Amino acid sequence: KYGIKPDMVLPTCGSDEMVDLIAKTFIDPGSEVVMAEVTFPRYLSTSQMMGANLKIVPMKNMAYDLEGFRRAITPQTRLVWLCNPNNPTGSFFARDELIRLLESISPETLVVYDEAYFEFAAHPEYPRDSLDLLQRHRNMLVMKTLSKAYGIAGLRIGFTIGDSALLGMINKIRNPFNVTLLT
């Protein structure tokens, strides 16, 4: 349906491992990283661990301020973390807002779009079809997890969909046996 090929999917031991792998692959000391003030805490800890220059965008009513993201992102921005719906606030942004943001970002800037709570978003304006955006935005990675929606948090299984070249770079540092037989 979305033109997703097998080499555009990388399984991991949950989204947590993928956040770590993305940070280790794409963030160098001093790299500019943009993220929300209140969001999944692993974005902050892994970015700090890699020595990133963090630009924290304040929330508006506990929701992402994508206009604030546009102002914060510069030609030097290496990576942008997005969580939709946001963890821990539960707020979300609509597809048209996401597209406007993506179109304002340089193709040299990696955009990580985390959909860990995708299945729990019932609002009609929540973007149900982000995967089609990968065709136009090859600098975007979409993270998904099976742990939340299927109640299997202890099994630690997730995957990321995106450009095969980006996933190939991540795969070079991934442990070869990271996803267990049981998961």
Where do the language-model regions lie?
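Phosphate-binding glycine-rich loop
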Residues: 1-32, 50
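Conserved beta-strand segments of alpha/beta enzyme cores
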Residues: 8, 53-55, 139-141
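Short glycine-rich anion-binding loops that position phosphate/pyrophosphate groups of nucleotides
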Residues: 15-16, 40, 84-88, 118, ...
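PLP-dependent aminotransferase-like
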Residues: 25-82
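Active-site pre-lysine segment of PLP-dependent enzymes
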Residues: 48, 66-75, 88-111, 115-147
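PLP-dependent aminotransferase class I/II
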Residues: 139-183
